[in-house]
Amino acid sequence: MVALTPLGIAALALLAERPMHPYEMYQLLIQRREDRVVKVRRGSLYHAVDRLLEQGLAAVRGTERAGNRPERTSYEITDAGRERLGGTIAELLATPVNEYPRFPLALGECHNLPRHEVIELLGARVALLQAELAEIEQLMASATARGVPRLYWVDVDYRATLLRTEISWLTATVADIASGDLPWLDSGAATFPHSPN
């Protein structure tokens, strides 16, 4: 059994809502800002739908033509697709997976840069994260005002919580670096201990 890609999961979840064609799926993913959590490109989405068909997780519903536009094929989720979607979501919810993000690697190696540069770079990161958080908070306020149940944007709430936590941690860490509470190699105050072999 081939694992579903994040885009495959998103496509299958859309088909679980109702039958649709890939262009409509693409528009919905962008409109719902799913591109924050899934890399969404039209060509990749069509390829993901093809893979769902090959695996028997989706089926052709029909073909339609509107005016002089090209024909569009609509797809629907199969019973196997519903089962696979549910199983995949359950596994992802229950089992933590190290996705090897790059930022912790950069943090682990930031001692290779001068202290002033790290302070500046982390400050720039905080500013970008604050801008993203402000945008997300506007989305959450808008969803609440429109009466959209939180269940449908709980992932956005999760992202906001992660952003708040990262901003708080980075702000404190930058302050520690700037004050010298976190000694820096270029200050001569910290040396890396050699481990005995």
Model-derived segments and their meaning:
Residues 137-156:
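Acidic interhelical loop/turn segments
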Residues 1-98:
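Basic helix-turn-helix/winged-helix DNA-binding cores
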Residues 86-134:
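Amphipathic alpha-helical dimerization/coiled-coil segments
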